[in-house]
From Swiss-Prot:
Protein name: Bifunctional lycopene cyclase/phytoene synthase
Reaction equation(s) it catalyzes: all-trans-lycopene = gamma-carotene; gamma-carotene = all-trans-beta-carotene; 2 (2E,6E,10E)-geranylgeranyl diphosphate = 15-cis-phytoene + 2 diphosphate
Gene Ontology terms describing biological process: carotenoid biosynthetic process
Lineage: Eukaryota, Fungi, Dikarya, Basidiomycota, Ustilaginomycotina
Key words of the record: Carotenoid biosynthesis, Isomerase, Membrane, Multifunctional enzyme, Transferase, Transmembrane, Transmembrane helix
Amino-acid biosynthesis among keywords: no
Length: 685
């Protein structure tokens, strides 16, 4: 047997120093992964990047020193810088850099899923995989200890086995059933790829280093089994189990934070990817409590609950996917907690809009549905901070209240289910969104309904640009304020519900852009300024929407949102024609009017372009304010969402004569959406 204290002459000479190995294999990959992930890194992700390398370093250091002391590994002196204990400094660096690589890679793969969708209530099946996993790990621990006898061929294999079994037992107990509940697409596949991809990469790097003598595995303490040429089975096992530990830890963090987010706190938001104060001992106490308890306690029944039923959340997100591909795609860039909140908020807006516009026939039925929506808002806010102090909270769950309200309404069951789910899902947001903002949105829907009023004198007719801005404030500017309030609240800086925002937006605006001006969001004036810009952005994007849909709104809905004072003198009758649907669209052949009495789409186009110029002016002034959002991944997602939607204006400008004549809506391809989103996220344009 080769003596452990003296290297063999048969071992390869070192032609690659450990430092150069890192420059070739680990540092470039880590840098690339960090640059790609940087715009999306939440406070939870940063916690993983801080805590996991520290834990890995502490757990591995004594074990690695023992391994090297017993000559399972060997390093040529001229290939390393210096040692601390028995281990080269570059090896300590490897502990950290591998943890960063695997954690960043796992973050990029798993950020698209919503962990809160997969929390399950306590049941005997809760630990159906965890218990066997712990038993297997403990068995491996015992066998590893028996095999880890110095100066034997099983030593290195046994050391890896017992050393990895303890953390794996703990982490698999906390994550394996959670991953299983997520299914193949959201859980098992990302989990496997998160483990295997860095494992294969590190196997390749290990072969490269072993062939060049950067380090050497002592044959006397190895099984000398080489599934891959030059790569001992112990090295393959080491990188596999270390990546398995790191990925299990990432999923365990996600599960614990998802559980914590269900809690209700009076003076602070629940722990989430957007709010995770690492400097507070209370954070670690809550995380540990979440680790050891059931995934989902009974859901709170009041509107103050911090959580959303997974079934309601899934239904709301399905509404979002069907209603707006652009918003749904851009929302994927948000942290999963904000994607949950803003997705539910947008879903309720869409459901309410559909109840008023699409799911009822006739003005009377639509007006009745508007009253139902108003009653739903009242029911949601019955237990909110805005409710009268002397009023006792209702014992009836929010979801049941809404179901009761919808029961007598003549709507399809699917519509009722979607409405109830979306409404119940916004209940946790009542602590951040004032009730009056929902009423403001309903005022905009009322204006839409008045387009159909039988009395011509009472029908909606926008006279001035101020009227158009007022309408846009109601249906879009208010949504911008809501979203901003939710983001600030979830990040720990809740806006007082009584704070009202100036609704005066001059077109063209005389207010300066916010570029280069840092806001102090602890000051009411600066918070007001940010909310104002959020409203201005909402109005800007609504004008894009109106410009895109001038022809379809006229043909399908008999509506015209262009104000009277926008039309040139020679087009004085165009507004009446658009309100009557008298527009010469090639694809429409049902009209009995002569061609000369119809408005030509090409004549309408100039007003669409004029409206786009107004929109672009507001957009250019409001866009810099996104940099003031105190949450980097939220900034990335909002920049992408706003940029993608504003780019529809560019598609309108690029429409062909045929597109215009046929009244086609300008649309963006998935490729164009992706390019715009990437440009906004990484380059800010």
């Amino acid at each position: 047997m080769t003596r452990l204290y003296q290297p063999s002459q048969d071992w390869p000479a070192c032609t690659l120093s450990y430092r150069h190995f890192h420059l070739l294999w680990t540092l470039p990959l880590c840098a690339v992964l960090f640059l790609v992930a940087r715009p999306f890194l939440t406070k939870l992700d940063r916690a993983k990047l801080i805590l996991l390398p520290i834990i890995a370093f502490v757990w591995t250091t004594p074990w690695d020193n023992l391994i090297v002391k017993n000559r399972a590994w060997f390093y040529h002196r001229h290939c390393i810088w210096f040692t601390i204990g028995y281990v080269p400094i570059e090896e300590y660096f490897f502990f950290v850099i591998q943890s960063l690589i695997s954690t960043l890679w796992c973050t990029l793969l798993t950020r698209w899923a919503l962990p809160n969708l997969y929390l399950v209530p306590s049941s005997p099946k809760r630990r159906r995989l965890a218990t066997p996993a712990v038993v297997v790990c403990m068995l491996c621990f015992v066998l590893g200890l028996k095999a880890a006898v110095p100066e034997t061929h099983s030593y290195y294999f046994g050391m890896i086995t017992w050393w990895s079994s303890l953390p794996l037992a703990l982490l698999l107990w906390g994550s394996v059933d959670f991953v299983s509940n997520m299914g193949v697409r959201a859980g098992l596949a990302p989990f496997a790829l998160s483990v295997l991809a860095p494992t294969f990469y590190l196997w390749a790097s290990d072969v490269y280093a072993l062939r060049r003598g950067t380090w050497h595995i002592n044959e006397a303490t190895s099984l000398n089994v080489f599934p891959i040429p030059h790569l001992p089975i112990e090295e393959m096992l080491f990188f596999l189990v270390t990546n398995l530990i790191l990925v299990s830890a990432c999923f365990t963090f996600d599960r614990c934070v998802a559980i914590c987010r269900q809690s209700v706190a009076e003076n602070a938001p629940p722990l989430s990817p957007s709010y995770l104060p690492l400097g507070s001992l209370d954070t670690y106490t809550k995380l540990w409590a979440a680790f050891v308890r059931s995934d989902r306690p009974p859901v709170a029944t009041s509107a103050a609950s911090a959580s959303v039923e997974p079934r309601d959340l899934a239904a709301s997100l399905q509404v979002l996917r069907a209603a707006s591909k652009s918003f749904n795609a851009a929302s994927l860039l948000l942290p999963w907690d904000l994607r949950t909140d803003l997705g539910c908020l947008y879903a309720f807006c869409r459901v309410a809009d559909d109840l008023v516009d699409d799911d009822a026939q006739g003005l009377e039925a639509k007006s009745s549905n508007l009253d139902v929506i108003r009653a739903i808002v009242d029911a949601i806010y019955a237990d909110s901070p805005e409710a009268a102090p002397q009023k006792q909270p209702s014992a009836q769950p929010v979801s049941d209240r809404i179901r009761t309200l919808l029961a007598p309404v003549a709507l399809p069951d699917k519509v009722k289910q979607d409405t109830r789910a979306a409404a119940a899902s916004i209940a946790p947001l009542t602590r951040y969104i004032p009730k009056r903002l929902w009423y403001e949105m309903l005022q905009g829907y009322s204006l839409d309904l008045l387009f159909e009023h039988p009395d011509a004198d009472k029908r909606t007719r926008l006279r001035t640009m101020d009227d158009l801005v007022e309408y846009s404030q109601c249906v879009a500017g208010v949504v911008g304020e809501m979203c901003t309030r939710v983001i600030l609240g979830r990040c720990g800086g809740a806006v007082p519900l009584e704070l009202k925002v100036d609704r005066t937006i001059a077109v063209p605006s005389t207010k300066a852009a916010m570029a280069g001006k840092a806001l102090d969001l602890t000051r009411a004036d600066d918070v007001h300024a940010l909310l104002y810009e959020a409203r201005r952005m909402g109005v800007s994007l609504q004008l894009v929407n109106i410009a895109r849909d001038i022809v379809p709104d006229s043909v399908e809905l008999r509506r015209c949102y262009l104000p009277t004072d926008m039309f040139d003198k020679q087009d004085a009758r165009m507004q009446d024609a658009l309100l009557a649907g008298h527009i010469a669209v090639r694809s429409q052949h049902t009209t009995t009017l002569e061609e000369k009495e119809l408005v030509q789409p090409r004549d309408v186009r100039k007003y669409a372009l004029r409206l786009l110029r107004v929109s672009r002016g507001l957009y250019d002034q409001a866009y810099p304010a996104l940099a003031q959002i105190p949450n980097r991944p939220a900034r990335a997602g909002l920049k992408a969402a706003c940029s993608v939607y504003a780019a529809i204006g560019t598609r309108i400008e690029a429409q062909t004569e045929t597109d215009v004549a046929e009244g086609r809506r300008a649309r963006m391809s998935n490729r164009d959406r992706m390019l715009r989103a990437v440009s906004a996220v990484y380059f800010g344009v």
